[in-house]
């Protein structure tokens, strides 16, 4: 146990100190990729939602000791940022062509080729989940599995298109104002997490608000417009045969779209985890809710944690907290069943 705790401490220290950043030149511009871990291990790539990068989308999950022991023990992590979303990014030149979702998916292929990666595990949130799903449809042989959080899969409705067209125009004229920060935070977090006049917003929301203030409006606008021009993936999803694990908060604005995606996927290869009292970013708001489903999902690929960090009754990894449905043979890769879960929110 001492050896395991030391290994987890080293992994968390590596995450806190930052990975190695690479700037990959693609046909559609340069892409920032931050790499954590041993590049000899299987690859797990991540892609964030609009206006975010890996620190504001995945830090909550990757700073959980149990998640570190599961993920960095089995994978080398490649955090891909949409163009202009990386830390210290310069404003995008107005003359540069605006990318489409197809262009962004093609960039992922170029990133994989740059690092000489074959088939990879993919993890994405909302718009990032859409980009990775599109990539999986176009390049099935390059995807081992998908972990999608509050994913998009349909073309935007007229009301959604109009809403984000207004947001895009506000970004163009005013940059990331206080009003726009509130709009994006509603996209990411539950009402409980955002607080009220009587209850302060949670620390994770406060930190996300701060990070939003560092984004360049022109870069956000380009990614937002690409997502606002997305097409329906429903038909393509029906042909996907890679194992897919989907998380969604029951207060996510994209809850119904996530349920639609689940119906489009082959039930033999997909599972849904609905997290109660949570918004879209389960990775930040309730990261512990992801641990047990991911652990059993990875077992289907022959991947395991080196040992349990804690066997106390309060630990989210203790056997008493494991859903009986996850112990079925189907959950080990033969067939994954929809479940619902709620676990403690603090790491």
Swiss-Prot record:
List the subcellular locations. Answer: Cytoplasm
- Name the UniProt key words of this record, in alphabetical order: Cytoplasm, Growth regulation
Q: Which SUPFAM superfamilies match?
A: alpha/beta-Hydrolases
Give yes or no: UniProt keyword Isomerase: no
One Gene Ontology cellular component term attached to this UniProt record is: cytoplasm
Cytoplasm recorded as keyword: yes
Q: Which GO terms describe its biological process?
A: regulation of auxin polar transport; response to abscisic acid; response to cold; response to jasmonic acid
The job of this chain, per UniProt, is described as: Involved in a signaling pathway that modulates root auxin transport and auxin gradients. Acts partially by positively regulating the auxin carrier PIN2 and AUX1. Acts, together with GB1 as positive regulator of meristem initiation and branching. GB1 and NDL3 positively regulate basipetal inflorescence auxin transport and modulate MAX2 expression in shoots, which regulates organ and lateral meristem formation by the establishment and maintenance of auxin gradients.
Subunit field text: Interacts with the heterodimers formed by GB1 and GG1, or GB1 and GG2. Interacts with RGS1.
What PANTHER family does the annotation carry? N-MYC DOWNSTREAM REGULATED
Q: Which family does it belong to?
A: Belongs to the NDRG family.
Would you tell me the protein name for this molecule? Protein NDL3
């Amino acid at each position: 146990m001492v050896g395991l705790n030391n290994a987890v401490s080293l992994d968390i220290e590596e995450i806190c100190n930052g990975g190695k950043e690479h700037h990959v030149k693609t046909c559609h511009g340069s892409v920032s990729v931050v790499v954590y871990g041993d590049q000899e291990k299987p690859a797990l790539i991540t892609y964030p939602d609009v206006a975010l990068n890996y620190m504001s989308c995945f830090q909550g999950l990757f700073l959980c000791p149990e998640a570190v022991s599961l993920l960095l023990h089995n994978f080398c992590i490649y955090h891909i940022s949409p163009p202009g979303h990386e830390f210290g990014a310069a404003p995008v030149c107005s003359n540069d062509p605006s990318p489409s979702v197809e262009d962004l998916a093609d960039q992922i292929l170029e990133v994989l080729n740059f690092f000489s990666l074959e088939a990879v595990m993919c993890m994405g949130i909302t718009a990032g989940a859409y980009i990775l799903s599109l990539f999986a449809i176009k390049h099935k042989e390059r995807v081992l599995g998908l972990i999608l959080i509050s994913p998009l899969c349909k073309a935007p409705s007229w009301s959604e298109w109009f809403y984000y067209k207004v947001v895009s125009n506000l970004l163009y004229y005013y940059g990331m104002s206080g009003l726009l920060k509130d709009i994006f935070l509603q996209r990411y977090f539950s009402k409980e997490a955002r607080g009220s006049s009587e209850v302060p917003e949670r620390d994770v929301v406060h930190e996300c608000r701060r990070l939003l203030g560092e984004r360049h409006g022109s870069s956000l606008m380009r990614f937002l417009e690409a997502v606002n021009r997305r097409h329906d993936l429903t038909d393509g999803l029906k042909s996907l045969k890679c194992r897919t694990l989907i998380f969604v908060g029951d207060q996510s604005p994209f809850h119904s779209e996530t349920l639609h995606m689940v119906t489009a996927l082959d039930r033999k290869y997909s599972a849904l985890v609905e997290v109660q009292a949570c918004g879209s970013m389960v990775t930040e708001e309730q990261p512990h809710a992801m641990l047990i489903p991911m652990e059993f999902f990875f077992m289907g690929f022959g991947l395991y944690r080196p040992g349990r960090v804690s066997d106390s009754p309060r630990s989210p990894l203790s056997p008493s907290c494991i859903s009986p449905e996850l112990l079925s043979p189907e959950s080990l890769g033969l067939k994954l069943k929809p479940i619902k879960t709620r676990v403690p929110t603090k790491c």
